[in-house]
Amino acid sequence: MGSQLALKSRIRSTESLAKIFNAQEMIASSHIAKARDVALNAKPYTDAIFDAVQALVAHTHITHPIAVKDEKNPRVAVLALTSDRGMAGPYTSSIIRETESLLSRLDAAGKQPELFVYGRRGSTYYKYRNRDIAATWEGDTDQPGVEIAETISNTLMDAYMKPAEKGGVSELYIVYTEFINMVVQKVRVLRMLPVEIVKNETKVPDPDEEAPATADVAPLYTFEPSLEKVLDAILPKYIQSRIHECLLTAAASETASRQNACLLY
């Protein structure tokens, strides 16, 4: 009799879990299309900002912090984008694994990484292991807004622009999950600052060939009031747009991972 009651209890528990997973899968499937579209729609703006920054920092003799790293300052900032909720398969564990790998590489290189965490699951993981965390943010990791991107970017900007003797950092890294499609999401490590110049391949022009189109010729810029002032103005927009894009593609990845995980049960 006792064994029958135990079996019935297990059956009821299994049925309850199945209902929970089914509900989670339905919620995730209703969110994924919007999350994917929002992430894709934000990309052109971020790409335009990045192209503008690339054009600015490509100028020689630039000494602005956006492009020049303080080699004497070993402190670097690492932002890990995790999730608030579970039931998302290996989503958060993959981010934590890559973050730990990055922290180890930075330590081996003589750096002093400072950890910033977005998402309750990640902050709980590191707090449980008594890891020092410079700052944490929680709430709406599957639907991040511009406000949280601005808050995070302001904190990281303050850390980056602060002098080394006052605890500033010389580099900014972000660990996030890029949404490829519903099945594939890849963990990425992006160094946001200093900006790395992406150089295009060039070749010596042939006199017999036609001149390149105007779109292929690098434009000449005149900066008013100065290049440094322009960089001061564009730097906050660059950081916020990059972080916002990472938050959006991470949210789409989290939702897709949650839907896929629930489908397995």
Regions found by a protein language model. Give the residues of each.
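Conserved loop-to-helix interface motifs that mediate assembly, gating, or partner/ligand docking
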Residues: 2-261
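Conserved small/polar residues in nucleotide/adenosyl-binding loops
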Residues: 265
